């Protein structure tokens, strides 16, 4: 969207038949259901993207804010709703797990906000996070380093924070956001709780509608989308242009942006030149 808005001739090659990648819908007996992400957080990031290209998110997708951020069940019958209203979340924790757990949850929430405030710009909003950009933010509040709990995994850190194991289990799920295990993921992922507490939205028609909205906006700006396009390799020619092998044909371009798993490049899945 940004490139097309800037006057660049953009062609998107997508292996699947529809936009969105993992953000897709599949048919079921109850109708279409999300098969990837089911809700959206950090709505301002998407609003800012559309504004940058002279558009409005609301014109391309309908987002509806949820009062219940997440509902949790345990086999013993315990249920916990984390809410859009922070005080309601605190009261729900107190009701389900007691006063001590509520106090621990309150401190955890404060620490998650501190981590978010420190690392949002240099890490979460950066396409290429770098330690040199994080250090100045950390120096503004040196105690944040201890809050990061850098020597412990997410599971270890949560085990120390919560005397109630079910709360530790609940927040350990953030490891799945990066495809990791709680025992092997950094404690820093605790900041995701603050991201969720800022608001959770669902997209009318399913999350895939956001992808379709972004596609429509990009098309209006001049971008071209080619689906069922399987790129198997690319290399840079003597002229400086890149040659992409796609569906047994070669396409020429000035630059390549790869939006897949970086490990695929490192392992040579798109040819030795790409790795």
Tell what function each PLM region has.
Residues 1-120:
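N-terminal glycine-rich phosphate/pyrophosphate-binding loop and immediately adjacent elements
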Residues 6-8, 221, 251:
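Helix C-cap/helix->beta junction micro-motif
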Residues 75-184:
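Rossmann-like flavin
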Residues 245-255, 259-260:
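Core beta-strand elements of the Rossmann-like FAD/NAD(P) dinucleotide-binding domain
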Residues 258-275:
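Flavin (primarily FAD) binding-site architecture
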